[in-house]
Amino acid sequence: MLKGKVVGLSEDGTATIKAQVPLAQFLHREVKEVYVDMIDSRPLSDKQRRMCYALVKAIADWSGSGSEEVKEAFKLDFWAERVDTLSDKIFSLSNAPMSLVAEFQRFLVAFILTHDVPTKRPLREYVDDIEAYTYLCLVRRKCAVCGRRAELHHIDAVGMGNDRTEVQHEGREVMSLCREHHTELHTVGKAEFMTKYHLDGGVPCDRTIMKIYGLRR
């Protein structure tokens, strides 16, 4: 593996990377592909660390295992799924980069949503990336507010003047809500609802979501 560093960055975002290639490889044109991994040097925050440990503890309490055992098992599973893009060492929650910990956080949240693991506070309060959380809830068909079984909710009410069988779903703003919170949103309005539950709104409906909910287009 060759390692290099960014030596220049233009206003249009073009980066110049300098790496030392062994002369024999260069002369025989043996370097055919280049994989660039932009290393995130931002350290994780104390808030991120606390959130991860809280998620781990919730899983540990639910499974009857120890928190340390659960943490190491999930770190190993997370690493195994990303072995092609991560280093050869298991990361540590004491000094891992911010972006990696955020991805691990989403990994834990996905497990909790899939297996209905109870948490002391609403799950959305344990995440930094609300948009990613909203998408995970859609994929797992869980209410973004309470975690109960949910259905697809169009933020811009399809039922008002639109034929649901003819509407273009792809790209529309959606989120998953249980019947109770679906009704509440329509009662109090989008702005008040999102503020109350600290949500940023829906996410664009893509083909993955369309397939899950049986939408034709």
Residue positions per predicted region:
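Generic N-terminal amphipathic/basic segments
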Residues: 1-35, 40-43
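The feature represents the first ordered module of a protein
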Residues: 25-81
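Charged, alpha-helical interface segments at or near domain boundaries
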Residues: 70-121
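Short Cys/His-rich Zn2+-coordinating modules
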Residues: 121-133, 156-164
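Short cysteine-rich loop/turn motifs with clustered Cys
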Residues: 128-155, 180
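Histidine-centered nuclease catalytic patch
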Residues: 142-174, 190-191
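Short Fe-S-cluster ligation motifs
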Residues: 173-180, 204-217
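Short Cys/His-centered divalent metal-binding micro-motifs
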Residues: 174-195
